[in-house]
């Protein structure tokens, strides 16, 4: 009972096909692909926005003859 045989997987496949139908599975996979694509697009947009951000800073002048 510890491992699944080919018959277990065939029964699971038949149950999934009966529950969702033949037309619903490709639609679900398309929705998953669109979600992944939008997630990747959002990540690249966020990285581009953070790279464009400028930070105001002060210039610190040091004397060249000072020794620390």
Swiss-Prot record:
GO cellular component, one term: TAT protein transport complex
Record's keyword terms, sorted: Cell inner membrane, Cell membrane, Membrane, Protein transport, Translocation, Transmembrane, Transmembrane helix, Transport
A Pfam family hit: TatA_B_E
Annotated GO biological process: protein transport by the Tat complex
Residue intervals passing through the bilayer: 1-21
UniProt biased composition (Basic and acidic residues): 53-68
Cellular location(s): Cell inner membrane
Recorded topology in the membrane: Single-pass membrane protein
GO molecular function terms listed in the Swiss-Prot or TrEMBL record: protein transmembrane transporter activity
InterPro entries assigned: TatA/B/E, TatA/E
Main location, first listed in the record: membrane
KW Glycoprotein (keyword) present: no
Chain positions covered by the region annotation Disordered: 46-68
Similarity comment: family membership: Belongs to the TatA/E family.
Subunit structure comment from the entry: The Tat system comprises two distinct complexes: a TatABC complex, containing multiple copies of TatA, TatB and TatC subunits, and a separate TatA complex, containing only TatA subunits. Substrates initially bind to the TatABC complex, which probably triggers association of the separate TatA complex to form the active translocon.
Role description: Part of the twin-arginine translocation (Tat) system that transports large folded proteins containing a characteristic twin-arginine motif in their signal peptide across membranes. TatA could form the protein-conducting channel of the Tat system.
NCBIfam families from the UniProt entry: PRK00720.1, tatAE
UniProt protein name: Sec-independent protein translocase protein TatA
Source organism of this protein record: Sinorhizobium fredii (strain NBRC 101917 / NGR234)
């Amino acid at each position: 009972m510890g491992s699944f045989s080919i018959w277990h997987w065939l029964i699971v496949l038949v149950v999934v096909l009966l529950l969702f139908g033949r037309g619903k599975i490709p639609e679900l996979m398309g929705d998953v692909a669109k979600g992944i694509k939008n997630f990747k697009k959002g990540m690249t947009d966020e990285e581009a926005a953070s790279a464009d951000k400028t930070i105001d800073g002060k210039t610190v002048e040091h004397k060249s003859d000072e020794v620390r």
